[in-house]
Amino acid sequence: MNIFTLLFIYFLSDTVAAYCYYGTEYKNATGCFQFFRTPLNFTNAVRFCRVNMKSTLVRPTSSIRNQQIRGAALKLGIEEYWIGASNVDNDWEWLDGSMLTYSNFDVGGGYPKKTESQIGAVSMSSLAGLWYTKLDAMFLPFVCEFPPSTVYDNGILYRSPKTQSLIFPSAGTKAALLMVDAVDQSRLYSKNEIGPLKTEAETGEKVYLKPINISTNGFPEFSGPPIVILNPYKRKIKVKPVMVSQTETEMSRSRKEKEETEDSINVKSLKEGGTARGNGSSVAEELNSNSKEKREREENETIRSKTIQISRG
């Protein structure tokens, strides 16, 4: 049984309020596209995009678009793939019947060439972005393209720009396989696997898990609501602890206790000395002076204690 491996690439825009299917690339508000590595012939590739993805084979309608698709294919390591152009009796046109207003055939290599069958197809090379004519019976990887949307469609998971809120489908059943959506998708997936790698914890973003089923014909079917988890390894800013300094009141309290001890010693000494010398009045005057100085210090300490600030380290 062939299992299609879905390949994941980046969003290029975070500002437009539109959504793309899960696992696709958003391109300047003009559409979304998705690569499939499993090779199909041209007819079945067209059918797969239309039936399973509700889309069409990608149409590189400009040089900019052509380079965008080529760059994504290079990143994924896909050398050649079907695009949405074909011919009937050597009239080359897009799948919707419109004429090719832009093309990038390898003219130096003699393309486009006449095909041996009545219907021919067009492939694109990621090495130079050039187009080639092929027999439609050949098997190649392919790219589906579809317009962006603002709603969900029957269990398919869309993703939005960072500033937008995601709305999840509510119906469906869970499946054994899960698909993961996060910011750095190239680090979450290898080229031939479905499932998260260990580095998903390093993205620092929400991770969206989407159940999928693999049907008997090998086509992936999306079903069930996504499971949203918060990345437990999201980077956190360390906050320094609050350090409360020793207040002036606390410092003065210890100083006051020391002074009171010294005063009691001085009073005792003065009394003993004054009695011996007969200078009782001098002792009283000195004690009054000391008491006055202590009251003034206490008043100043009270004022300073009201202006104490808690300092933070």
UniProtKB/Swiss-Prot annotation:
Residues 1-17 form the signal peptide. Glycans are attached at residues 28, 41, 213, 279, 300. Coiled coil: none annotated. Residues 244-313 are annotated as: Disordered. This is C-type lectin domain-containing protein 162. GO terms for molecular function: carbohydrate binding. One of its GO terms (cellular component) is extracellular region. Keywords: Disulfide bond, Glycoprotein, Lectin, Secreted, Signal. The gene is clec-162. Disulfide bonds join 49-144. The keyword Signal applies. Residues 28-145 form the C-type lectin domain. The lineage of its organism: Eukaryota, Metazoa, Ecdysozoa, Nematoda, Chromadorea. Residues 250-259, 291-304 have a biased composition (Basic and acidic residues). InterPro entries: C-type_lectin-like (IPR001304), C-type_lectin-like/link_sf (IPR016186), CTDL_fold (IPR016187), Snaclec (IPR050976). It is found in: Secreted.
